[in-house]
């Protein structure tokens, strides 16, 4: 068994030294002992060290990652804010040093993918078949999704103490495959409960408490003074985020039988086929060994696993209803049951500060289960009902003189024709032009693509630069660099708006399993050959100051808000 010999970030206790974990000999984890006030990537950044070995280990051979020099990193200089004036008139300049009045501060995390790694209905069998998307099907870091979220919550609490947050929001893909136990783990971590990140029978791959990924732990819980909200992602109501749940997989997931499926990327009837056994991870082994994955015809038998009724799939409405079973605020975390339909609506809006003219419009732009597709269900879409609801919200906000932010899982205008984009480019382009007619719209925030991308949607009329908006995507909390963002909405002295979007790395000082996850996340990226060039600097992190013009009416209203007469 291999051990971590240097856990310099941990407090001195039984969990610190000589602890046997499913990790690597001499794994050096840089200390964030002096992380405060170096809390964001503006202050410091994770620098991935180059691999010199000519041998690349298999992604399934986590025990050898460190032996071949994979997963190593250290802290380096931070990334300053890149001031973006794309939406402003030609010749405009803004002194970055001038004083700014803060209107709103919040954090957003996305694509957390809380994962039951022992589910009999995984997508592990497909990881060698889909290129870089394979990382979404399998990686050793899947063992630690609960602990990474706990580290992010701890970090948000620390940031809140330094500079208070008005709210937090999760932008969808809270879980990996819409299972009840995954949804409960997500909510319970935010609520600060005892977490048992194990399913089936109790596993203890490394005997003793608090020393392996299956062991129970006490979640920190989000500071009770921070309200948190949620948006729906495709993984929150589709099997593995790609196919509607049918009776076959619904029965399999709570049974001892590993699910079998066809070619999910080409066959519309794949969920009723048995070409592949999807596989699972053996929770009794230190590294979560893959079992039961392969071409069905080439397997003598598929192993049975311990069944668990808590793995049952939840519908979209049931996921939203579960958000009401919480000890933190607001109850329901944004989702409101409508009396007319007797169901939950994945779209809602809220005003984070009673005296501030700004509202957040939370939009469900995932596909509907009733659609018939030959490929996957990861596209963005708005049918007439949701589209009309969005436009009514924007019209009301404009009429009432409120700044507006759209929060959705799937971004807009970024990947035409791709499974991570919108299903209909024409509809998407029309929506972009509609959005530009609402000058009080500041920002569309999203996840889904697991990128730190920023895009400007400038006005089509140079005489009205206010008819424009920004879009900011945020990285997945699961894969490297495992970040979330803070957003600061500021009023400049010239009555323009600055939006500071800042990447944050979770603090790992008190969380050895989050530290291991970071190591695995970096190694997995290196093994899959993934290079992030999703922003102008070609770096995984991207901090920006986004400047936006306001109408004369909103300039006056906000100036009076800051300095009332």
Segment roles from a protein language model:
Residues 26-160, 166-167, 208-209, 250-400, ...:
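Metal-dependent phosphoesterase/phosphodiesterase active-site architecture
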Residues 108-110, 167-173, 224, 229-233, ...:
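Active-site neighborhood of phospho(di)ester-bond hydrolases with catalytic His/Asp-centered motifs
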Residues 187-192, 220-222, 430-439, 455-469, ...:
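Short, surface-exposed basic-aromatic patches at helix termini and helix-loop junctions that form
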Residues 370-388, 395-445:
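Active-site-proximal segments of metal-dependent phosphoesterases and phosphodiesterases across multiple
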């Amino acid at each position: 068994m291999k051990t971590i010999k240097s856990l310099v970030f941990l407090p001195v206790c039984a969990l610190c030294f000589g602890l046997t974990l499913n990790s690597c000999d001499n794994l050096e984890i840089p200390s964030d002992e002096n992380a405060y006030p170096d809390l964001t990537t503006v202050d410091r950044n994770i620098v991935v060290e180059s691999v010199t070995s000519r041998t690349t280990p298999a992604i399934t051979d986590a025990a050898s990652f460190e032996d071949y020099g994979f997963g190593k990193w250290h802290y380096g200089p931070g990334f300053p804010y890149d001031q973006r004036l794309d939406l402003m008139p030609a010749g405009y300049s803004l002194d970055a040093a001038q004083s700014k009045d803060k209107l709103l501060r919040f954090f957003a995390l996305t694509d957390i993918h809380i994962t039951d790694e022992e589910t009999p209905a995984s997508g592990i069998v497909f990881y060698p078949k889909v290129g870089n998307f394979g990382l979404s099907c399998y990686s050793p870091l899947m063992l630690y999704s609960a602990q990474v979220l706990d580290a992010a919550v701890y970090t948000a609490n620390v940031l809140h103490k330094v500079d208070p947050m008005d709210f937090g929001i999760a932008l969808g893909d809270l879980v990996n495959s819409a299972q009840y136990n995954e949804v409960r783990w997500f909510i319970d971590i935010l609520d600060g409960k005892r977490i048992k990140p194990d399913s089936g029978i109790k596993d203890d791959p490394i005997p003793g408490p608090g020393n392996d990924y299956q062991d129970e732990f006490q979640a920190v819980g989000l500071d009770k003074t921070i309200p948190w909200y949620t948006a729906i992602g495709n993984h929150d109501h589709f099997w593995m985020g790609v196919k509607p749940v049918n009776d076959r997989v619904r029965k399999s997931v709570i049974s001892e039988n590993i699910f079998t499926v066809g070619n999910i990327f080409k066959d519309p009837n794949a969920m009723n086929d048995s070409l592949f056994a999807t596989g699972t991870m053996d929770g009794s082994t230190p590294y979560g060994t893959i079992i039961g994955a392969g071409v069905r015809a080439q397997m003598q038998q598929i192993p049975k696993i311990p069944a668990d009724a808590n793995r049952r799939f939840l519908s979209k409405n049931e996921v939203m209803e579960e958000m009401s079973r919480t000890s933190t605020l607001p109850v329901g975390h944004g989702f409101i049951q409508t009396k007319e339909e007797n169901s939950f609506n994945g779209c809602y809006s809220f005003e984070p500060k009673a005296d501030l003219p700004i509202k957040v419009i939370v939009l469900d732009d995932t596909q509907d289960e009733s659609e018939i597709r030959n490929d996957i269900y990861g596209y963005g879409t708005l049918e007439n009902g949701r589209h009309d609801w969005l436009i009514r919200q924007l019209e009301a906000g404009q009429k009432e003189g409120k700044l507006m932010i759209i929060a959705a899982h799937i971004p807009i205008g970024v990947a035409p024709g791709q499974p991570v984009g919108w299903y209909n480019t024409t509809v998407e382009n029309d929506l972009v032009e509609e959005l530009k007619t609402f000058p009080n719209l500041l920002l569309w925030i999203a996840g889904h693509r697991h990128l730190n991308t920023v895009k400007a949607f400038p006005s089509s009329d140079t005489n009205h630069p206010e008819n424009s908006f920004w879009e900011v995507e945020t990285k997945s909390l699961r894969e490297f660099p495992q970040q979330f963002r803070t957003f600061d909405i500021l009023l400049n002295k010239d009555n323009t708006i600055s939006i500071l979007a800042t990447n944050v790395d979770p603090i790992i000082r008190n969380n050895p399993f989050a530290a291991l996850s970071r190591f695995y996340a970096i190694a997995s990226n290196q093994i899959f050959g993934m290079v992030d060039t999703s922003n102008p600097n070609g770096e995984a992190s991207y901090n920006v100051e986004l400047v936006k013009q306001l109408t004369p009416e909103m300039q006056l209203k906000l100036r009076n808000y800051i300095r009332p007469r």
